[in-house]
Amino acid sequence: MMRCPRQFMPFVTFCTNLRPVTGLPRFRFSIRWENGIIMMKYDSLFLQWIIFRQKPKIGGANMKNKEADTELESRLLEILVHPCRIEDIRRELPNAGKNNLKNALDALIADGRVMKNKKNRFAVSAHYGCAAGTYLATERAFAFVAPDYPEGEAKPDDLFIPPNASGGAWHGDRVLVKVSERKNNRGRKEATVIRVLGRAGKELTGELVQRGKAFFVQPTSKKYPEIAVDKHDLGEAAVGDCVAVSISHYGDEQFMPQGVVRVDLGESGTMEAAIAAVLHENGVYDVFPNEVLEQALAIPQEVDMGTAGKRLDLRDKLIFTIDGDDAKDFDDAVSLEKLENGHYLLGVHIADVSHYVTPDSPLDAEAFRRGTSVYFPGHVVPMLPFALSNGICSLNPKVDRLAFSALMEVDKDGRRYGAKFAKSVICSKARMTYNKVNKILAGDKGLREEYAFLVETAETMNNLAHALYKRRIERGALELDIPEAEIRVDENGKPVEIRFRERGESEKLIEEFMLQANEAVAEYMCKRELPTVYRVHENPDPDKLRVFASFARPFGYRIDPSKPEDTAQFQTVLRGAKNDPKQRVLPTLLLRSLARARYADECIGHYGLKAKFYLHFTSPIRRYPDLVAHRMLQKALLGEEFTAADETMCEEAADQSTNREQAADNCERDIDKLYIASYMQQFIGEEFDAEVSGVQSFGVFVALENGCEGLIRAELMTGDFYQYDEEHMAMVGRHTGKRFTIGTPMRVKLLAASDTTGQIDFAPADGSLPVSEKLDRPRREDTDRAPRGNRAERRRHSGKGRGGKPGKGKKPPTRKRR
């Protein structure tokens, strides 16, 4: 329970004094801080007290205090390896100051890293047999806790939490647990939750139901308990609706959890409500606040050179965009000129969003909150209002647009000799698509005549892109060219085709050019030690590489997990997988072994790209880190002084952007599942060729040749009793020894597909099983899903959105395996 700040006490006293007035038998309230407002619930009574609305001050003093606090906490953790009294700690740290020491100890205790025993002795939690971590509920009575561990160390095994040992924790909460000295009969360490350190979230989605005169919300995920709702807190929701409920009381031995309906998401059991629930769960909102829309609509839709400032005029240059057929926001354009010394001037021209979205404006605050645009079939939830993203910021053809240009000198072999950056004004000569450029490069006569003015440039660009790619691979970059399913929808939003997204020459061309710009800007900022937001990718976990090495060994590969920096060994695997269908699972397994890329305020390099310097610069319309990179680069070019506030802003932007990217990925993945399930409903009862894509104790995941993935439950696997071999990630027959592991081919029958949960069920085709539209099994959750790696890094590091050919109608996803 958090301590009430002193300035809130008058309000708490006021609430407490309400009890005799209302006649309520017991005082119980929840407290929530949001945008400078204290939200407190006194049973069904809501009160608001505005404390302040101004932003907290940030500056050098705060930065120094933060660093000092971190240093003090580190010293305390070193001292408290053995139990100490407060007097002993003060003797060890005589200059710490009484208040600073108390605050540091309180922070460590609140975070679960330090504990105090009954004798008032402090020590690290591990000394008392305790550990802090994340509570991972299951759809049964038991759970697990993933313990915290220092960066760079091997991940410890999850701790098993038996029934009735949850301590009131909910899925995703941070908890402190007491670890048992003995292991259970499955060899797992057990633990008991002794304290909830922090709650994961305040809102859930589910169906509103009524039993008698009482109302409840049954959460979409069975990992959460049922929540009681007072009849006065239903809002406009009706029984049977899908709703978002905020938790006002998490429940205890006497009371069940209680909540308040916040949003009615539509009729439960419909795909529309399911999509709305996914968006809400991930904090993705389609509607912009009025003040944001007003600011966006007030921006002129034509370039005003009078207010554009001093700029490099590139309007006479051959500059054009290349995007997908259905793209609406064009945030990057390219150009290429031959220089007198035989080198090329490669131009990457990015929409100058920072000219229109200024710091601390409503537009900026909303862009920071959203962090990124979210894409799903036939729809986009933009980071910026369409007046900007599809209007004045979009590099539309044959109109003047403000840009931020990266002009790089490269030779025919892809060596970069230098780069210059400038605010510019451009006029795109053509809106090209990937399909058109691919056909031009393939020799399409009609298109080559129509776009004769850029054919030679496009061909030279393609040759340069090949040279850049070759140099990138030679330095050790990993080319994880893993097919990604593409869902095509009709004009009504109904899925009509699922297929793998194609990557032609033009897609690769744009990717290479965007990578060059991103690296050039990162190098410029990092070498000058200037603050910005970088895109970083750490070395993989050796334990995960050991698992990958065991899978690669039967194919003749010898992987040394202790040398992750030697990416040549992984490149050998990737080359072999391209030429052997039996090995095509290996790139996916390698991807799952890698760390997830993230944003940071420090330049530590990008492992997958083998780049010493890297950030995101090329998509400011749809990514907030790119917008920050633009602002910081412009400040550097103008020679302005950077402050501690800039450093703080970059750190906050990096953390927020990483979190919002993860939310966007979750959103896109879960909504794609709904569309795929909707599409597959027409094929229930049919058989398909498939391949095992993941193995868990409850069954095997299989993927069809169009990318659709579903589950075969263990009890439906016929011919033997199958047991899970966790070490080798395999399902093994007890009597026959038959093994199902990742990559095993199967013939499967589709049993069920739900467009409200996204779950798809298969069975082995040789089994005689009834076919139904629904199976009574729990919904598959993130912790149960076969991992798919860092989807965002596969799709976004190039700076491009989604593209692809238009759908050609419904196609069954079967074809003979070659």
Where are these regions (language model features)?
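Electropositive polyanion-binding surfaces
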Residues: P10, R91, V239, A244, ...
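A short macromolecule-binding patch
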Residues: E153-I161, Y224-V229, C708-Y724, S772-K774
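A generic structural signal for residues embedded in beta-strands
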Residues: V177, V245, V695, V748-L750
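Internal insertion modules embedded within essential enzymes
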Residues: G206, Q254, L751-A765
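Intrinsically disordered, low-complexity linker and terminal regions at domain boundaries
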Residues: R713-T756, I760, E773-E781, R785
